[in-house]
């Protein structure tokens, strides 16, 4: 989100081209980053699911990755719309007759609404997934209780703020969502890496 391009006011055709290029690069990086994050989420789910003392894997962890997969599809659509479709429409608008401006703005408003809908779906679904992972960790371990507690609180707060409309998912609003969720993923990842290192050392000592 730190390199997400922002455009405001009247754009020249040259500015529209530069905005489209910057938007494509930023959103491509976002897609690649989220793919890596999703792979990490799969590893996290395997770790949490194995912590259940029963013979079957923990259902909360399994439900979390299913919900997160749903969130991933929504994010893919939102990113494609914001990063590729919207800039392409703006380029076409800049080269069209000025008299067609109102029609183009209606189209852009509709596409933006489409983007916002999927951004909300992603933000809420990803928060629910973090809540489920955190609840699984609180029940069976696998992640530090402080990290799990933060995940529960952050997920609920983000969901409520989005639901009541206090958190608008523009560039700055999405930055808040991404940062709050990224903090949880980074902390959980560090904890899992330390646990793995500790387990390896114990095996070597044995």
Stretches with model-predicted labels:
Residues 1-206:
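Hydrophobic, aromatic-enriched alpha-helical segments typical of multi-pass transmembrane helices
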